[in-house]
């Protein structure tokens, strides 16, 4: 269960980081 939770966290964290990065780029473009 712990390993599965770690895998789920990893899968969810990577797209979240890319989304945050994209949002930061868009915000910098529109400022």
UniProtKB/Swiss-Prot annotation:
GO terms for cellular component: cytosol; Golgi membrane. The gene is COG5. Required for normal Golgi function. The keyword Membrane applies. This is Conserved oligomeric Golgi complex subunit 5. One of its GO terms (biological process) is protein transport. It is a peripheral membrane protein. It is found in: Cytoplasm, Cytosol; Golgi apparatus membrane. It comes from the Eukaryota. It comes from Bos taurus. The keyword DNA-binding does not apply. The lineage of its organism: Eukaryota, Metazoa, Chordata, Craniata, Vertebrata. Keywords: Cytoplasm, Golgi apparatus, Membrane, Protein transport, Transport. Component of the conserved oligomeric Golgi complex which is composed of eight different subunits and is required for normal Golgi morphology and localization. Belongs to the COG5 family.
